């Protein structure tokens, strides 16, 4: 059986507890193949967020286009 494919669009959490990292773990638990497009990169841990750096819109668009031009995405999840 080929797993369904989901795309998450959101921020990257350096601590691994939120953002696309958490989304990809959830997709895996649901036996869904996860793809991602990163909107921002954070410097954070369990104590808080220290910094957020947004990616340029063109970079985000390129990530989304790359995934959608190749894979049959069945679901989309968005974050920050």
What is the meaning of each model-derived region?
Residues 1-75:
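Small-residue (G/A/S/T)-rich helix-start motifs and N-terminal tracts that mark the onset
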């Amino acid at each position: 059986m080929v797993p369904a494919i989901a795309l998450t669009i959101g921020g990257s959490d350096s601590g691994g507890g939120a953002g696309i990292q958490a989304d990809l773990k959830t997709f895996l638990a649901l036996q869904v193949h996860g793809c991602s497009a990163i909107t921002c990169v954070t410097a954070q841990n369990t104590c808080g967020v220290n910094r957020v750096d947004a990616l340029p819109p063109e970079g985000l668009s390129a990530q989304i286009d790359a995934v959608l031009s190749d894979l049959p995405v069945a679901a989309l999840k968005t974050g920050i």
